[in-house]
Amino acid sequence: FTGALYSEKLRGLMTEYGVPLTVENDQTRFGKQQPMVGFFKAAGEAALPITMTFDMGNWCWTGEDPIQAAGLLAEHVGYVHVKAAVPQGTSYRAIALDDAGPGWQSLLHRLPAAVPRGIEFPLEGDDLIAVTRHYVTLLRNV
């Protein structure tokens, strides 16, 4: 977020198309905490009904603490991309929650419980239906 919100243009497009707008913290410098905080502050001041897609794993790529990000941004979260990541070379890669430590659960508890959660990591195994059911059940019970 560079400071230019174009609130009337956004409001017009949201009204014209009748779809909700959610903004995700991506893996670039624009997905860091301060640009996201600035964006949602400006959106709130403009009374724009924009929510956040909180991608739990993308904070690895930006080098920021996801727990701190949750504290700063949880009130804006309307959707959660559930993802854990581990270092790979000079970057990161998404991993299954069973292969991650317990930190993802602690992070998820700091985010709104009533918003949709999407699995955003590779589902792998011989029985993908069973694997999918496993993770859906796991996320329902966190």
Give short role names for the model-derived ranges.
Residues S7-G18, F39-L48, Q68-G78, Q105-A114, ...:
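Acidic (Asp/Glu)-rich catalytic clusters
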Residues L21, D55, V80, R117, ...:
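Conserved, mostly hydrophobic/aromatic
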Residues F1-G3, M36-V37, D99, L111, ...:
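Generic low-polarity alpha-helical segments
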Residues V19-P20, I50-T53, P87, S91, ...:
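General secondary-structure edge motif
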Residues L128-V142:
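C-terminal helical cap(s) of enzyme catalytic domains, especially alpha/beta-barrels
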Residues F1-M52, W61:
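Active-site acidic/histidine proton-transfer and metal-coordination neighborhood
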Residues Q33, N58-P116, P122-D126, A130:
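Gly/Pro-rich active-site loop or hairpin
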